[in-house]
Amino acid sequence: MTSNILQIPFRRSHTVSLSDAITQYISTKYDQRPDMFADDLLIIDRLRNEAIHVQEPHVSGISRLVTYAAQLKWLGGKFPVDIGVEFPWYPAFGFNTSRPISQNNIRFELANILFNLVALYSQLAFSVNRTTPDGLKQACNYLCQAAGVLAHLRADILPDLRASPPEDMDDMTLQSLEQLLLAQGQECFWQKAVKDGLKDASIARLAAKVSDFYAEGGDYAVQSNAISPEWIHHMTAKHHHFAAAAQYRQSLDCLEKRKYGEEVARLRDSEVCVNEALKESRWINRTVLGDLQGLKNRVTEDLKRAEKDNDVIYLNPVPPKSELKIIDRACMVAAKAPSQVTDAISMLGDNGPLGQPLFSKLVPYAVHIAASIYSDRRDRLVNETIIGELETMTDKLRDLLSSLNLPGSLQALEKPLGLPPTLVSHAEEMRQQDGLNRLRRSLEDTARVKANDKAAYNEGVELLAAEKAEDDSSRRKYGTDRWAREPSEAAASKLYTTAREIDGYFSSAQSSDNLVEQKLRDSEAVFRVLTGTNRDLEMYVPSSRRAAIPPEVERESIRLRGCLSEVSRLENRRKRRAQALKDKARTDDISKLQGWEAARLEREFPMQAIQASQFEDLFEEQLHLYDTDLEMVTQEQHEQDQISAQVREANRAFTRAHTGDASTKEREKALQELENGYLKYKEIISNIEVGRKFYNDLAKIVGRFRDDCKAFVHQRRMEASQIEGDITSVAAMASLNLSQPHLRQYSQQPTQPAQPVQPAQPVQPPNQLPPQPQPVQHQPPRDEPLTAPQPTRANTRPSMAPGVWSPEMGIRFGAQGTWDPSKGVKFS
């Protein structure tokens, strides 16, 4: 069926399982199970099958294509573009329409679906009845929508393809098709205007714009490698056709306005244009050619009449074409993509026209990463900036008390005999925890984790070293010209950098481990006393003589005791606040807020993968929950400064008022050593816990490092095996080429006279090898085409030595034509 408009052909595809790739990706990258989305997996495959089988112009295909396209846009924010399935599509234009192009790319799939939507709209316009005004209006609408989808594809989809588009989807091809669709839509409007009997001037303006659209489409088509010459000729003919039609209609307007000279000029130009269009008659269809012939007949008749009337009656001067006013353009079409294409994401929902979004309950992988980033940032704020600062302040306060020999000096005065209750409670706590043995077991556990980390790290380093040695050996063996791949350190620069970083972690951690072990050795004697019996404590702490306490000393001791009690209350309050802060952080769940933010990002930025960095504003807002805790740290520091000043002043007054004897001084020293020993015990426990957490976290890093090293070494060894195979093949071919000159030399030696042939003896035929072809030398391209070489054959067959069989002789058997194997082979 021929027509005066062109229809864009569909692209074709094979059935592939998108659900299998999505299932595999969810299994490996998400914390959710694929069976939670069993229905969605079935639906996505069904939508694809329905979409790729839209190959006929029927309006039902529109909903199938736009629904699947909307889901693809939605999936673009859930999954990476290279989801893991090769989408095969046959081109619609060009010279390779029988060979599919496959890409592991969701956007490539979306681009093909939208292209088929363009084809469907154009074929619907082709199939409607364009002999009626309503049919022309419907066809124009279809063509404008097709051009709009094409513009959306070119401007919004293909730039994010992350790969080279197919040949028939390059910019020149799509620009040409878009202008062609607009030209045909404008042509439908022009045809409707003719049927409705609009004024000739209006019809002329419409026709002029049709000509412009066809001209632009043809210009782009010439620069495309996919648009066929037949289509280019069609657009060229249409361009001249409507240029002629515009001038013809303008000439009728001139006749009506009695501009007889201008009428003749425009008819002459119309005739020139229609003749230009008829130059394409060999390549255009009968319908277009018939329209051109009809226009030419009308123009020719009117031109004869106009020239005769003007020459005989009106005698108006005929202006040259350069003086004719350019016909104004009336553009009645525009590229308008349907909202189901441009706003597809907003139309997905519970009551949306395009159905529910698939995999809506699947949390994007970036959200999981963002959640871990927030958790790390929150924990760092809580544990280091707030709790860590409180612990640092408490340590400074304890150091102050230790430097002032408190509370040992006060305890020695208040209780000259026996053990202070505080000391007894500290010793009981350490005994219940099996203090010294607990420290040793903790150090041994930490050492085991450290050894495992070191073993995994060494395994990865040894793999890298082995691969580097293999690569260097092959490079020395084959030379840098043939072994031209990157050296190991350049190919795995990130792995080598990671190895150096991990080695630095071990070095710095070893210094910390040595410091903790030194602390344990220095305090081991005191720990033995504290974990012993009360009898051991009493023997360690000497008693002083009980003496009357002067009123001034008693007054200052009470004051100092009050300051120490305030310090104890301060420490206990900080412990409670630290625990409350940990509970607050534990219940700080940002997942719901992240889900809302992810949904907003998916709606506002479809086809854009969500990145963890997009949640930064949410993180900052959520971390404001801890502003009051940060202010609390400042208040604690201010209060500690005041208490520290009070302790110093009270201790100075106490020291001036109290001068004890030698036994009192020894008791003070012993009590202070035990108090400091208890504090050192707490400090070492904290240090060991920090070290254990460090090595547990490091285990994940070195494990990932080792796995990456294994993958890299495997890939490099496979690559090395392939390179060695290529080198061996090239060497074999080179040795074959080197042997050919010797064969030629041997074949050119003079043949010795033939000897009499002995019966039943195998005869060695002389070499009759033809000269070997010389290697083709690559010459630079020349402007003129090269003449194809013609094969040459010898005119005469070389003579064969007697008794030598040649293929031309055929196979003949003597006697009865049978061969007896027992008699052997004889030549006669």
Curated annotation (Swiss-Prot):
<dbReference type="InterPro" id="IPR038499">
    <property type="entry name" value="BRO1_sf"/>
</dbReference>
<dbReference type="GO" id="GO:0005768">
    <property type="term" value="C:endosome"/>
</dbReference>
<comment type="function">
    <text>Required for the proteolytic cleavage of the transcription factor pacC in response to alkaline ambient pH. May act as a scaffold protein that recruits the calpain-like protease palB via vps32 to its substrate pacC.</text>
</comment>
<keyword id="KW-0175">Coiled coil</keyword>
<dbReference type="Pfam" id="PF13949">
    <property type="entry name" value="ALIX_LYPXL_bnd"/>
</dbReference>
<protein>
    <recommendedName>
        <fullName>pH-response regulator protein palA/RIM20</fullName>
    </recommendedName>
</protein>
<feature type="compositionally biased region" description="Polar residues">
    <location>
        <begin position="789"/>
        <end position="798"/>
    </location>
</feature>
<feature type="compositionally biased region" description="Pro residues">
    <location>
        <begin position="762"/>
        <end position="774"/>
    </location>
</feature>
<dbReference type="InterPro" id="IPR004328">
    <property type="entry name" value="BRO1_dom"/>
</dbReference>
<dbReference type="Pfam" id="PF03097">
    <property type="entry name" value="BRO1"/>
</dbReference>
<feature type="domain" description="BRO1">
    <location>
        <begin position="4"/>
        <end position="397"/>
    </location>
</feature>
<comment type="similarity">
    <text>Belongs to the palA/RIM20 family.</text>
</comment>
<comment type="subunit">
    <text>Interacts with pacC by binding to its two YPX[LI] motifs.</text>
</comment>
<feature type="compositionally biased region" description="Low complexity">
    <location>
        <begin position="748"/>
        <end position="761"/>
    </location>
</feature>
<feature type="region of interest" description="Disordered">
    <location>
        <begin position="743"/>
        <end position="828"/>
    </location>
</feature>
<dbReference type="InterPro" id="IPR025304">
    <property type="entry name" value="ALIX_V_dom"/>
</dbReference>
